[in-house]
Amino acid sequence: MTSRIFSLTAMIAISCLGAFATPSVMAKEKNPSDRQSDQLRQLTVLSYHEVTQNKNSLIPNYAVTATQFKSHLDWLTKNGYQFVSVDQVLEAKSGLKKLAPKSVLLTFDDGYASFYETVFPILEQRQIPALLSIVGAWLEPTTQQKVKFGDESVSRNQMLSWTQLQQMQKSGLVEIGSHSYDLHHGILGNPQGNTQPAATTRLYDRSTRTYESDRDYAQRIQRDLVKNNQLFKQHGLKAPRAMVWPYGR
């Protein structure tokens, strides 16, 4: 569930590539795009899911406590890292501004209520920006309905409300990104019956014994992303500028 981040306008990857920045001995004068790439290679992206004190977290293997999260922030600050926003990353990508040598972007996937309850107060207190990416289909049920979460159903109140999302977006600290409308699940990926990520897999049709075409795949993904963008606007949020792919690597 590690994620790579993309700009929705240009679909440009923003990934943690610092370890691979090795200058050539015979390097020539760099063109602007090379310099922009060097900027993004200095960016570290830390991906979180749940930050909660609840022992019954939705995804225990990916959850950390508030104490652990604060210790991460303390360590990063002590070691000279500077927290940056999506705005700053996009400005660096466009060549308008430079990122600090030890820039770090905090990302949070899925849209759990614990983000508002636990993470947001910490970000506000420390004035740290972050990217929060939500799965639209998980937020559509009403408070009386259940959310289909993997192979189980969970209470709607375990996910963020639209009012909470609006408040956090207005704070200027939290960028609300897309984590797809409904691609955070598996689909049939081959004749052997293996389930693979819906966002990156060509769907296999048992009845015709054929795979989804590249065109059909692209249209399916586009429909999903457009639907999530429309859902944002419907609930008073700005259209997302960042896309975090479910199960991306």
How would you name each of these model-derived features?
Residues 88-89, 110-113, 246-249:
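Short beta->alpha connector loops
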